[in-house]
Amino acid sequence: DIILWGSQLFCKPAGHGMAVPWHQDGQYWPIDPLATVTVRIAVDDSLPENGCMRYIPGSHKPRSVVAHEFVEASNVAIRQQVAELDESLAKDDALYAGQISIHDVYLIHGSSENRSTKRRSDYAIRYMPATSRYVRDPAFPANAYAAKTSQLMNYTWRPLWLLRGTDRAGNDFDIGHGRRAA
């Protein structure tokens, strides 16, 4: 019972790719109950020198979203970060082109700027169990946050695909796919 609910290309150009503050994806996504996984495929080598993803090992185990705070900076890709964090625990998630990593919605992660001469690009694919509901209500906290902070993110119209099994949560698989031919 698996739903594909999103994919995204992340690209940090050589010499100026933005930093991504420490965060948990669950802070932003309209899924209830919150259960999802991201499969990240390295398009380019994703190494410390070009801003690879970093993570806090075990931070997903409490199964809760920790407090995030607003970031007052213009050189970051997202404007929120985990409020309290021991960065000395961080590990690099270095990948070579073609390798993958998988991370949980509760994992605390981020990345530094790309100050190298090489681009860093990853393709992320997001899955959720068909026992969770993708919430399209604009008042749901993740949707309200996206509407307030980004003209590019409108989670209420995102298409879903039931890849396997049975939808057990009443998800709408018609929204976001455009008109169907008669």
Task: Give the label of every model feature segment.
Residues 1-54:
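Conserved double-stranded beta-helix
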Residues 13, 47, 62, 129-131:
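Feature marks short, surface-exposed loop/turn motifs that line or immediately flank catalytic pockets
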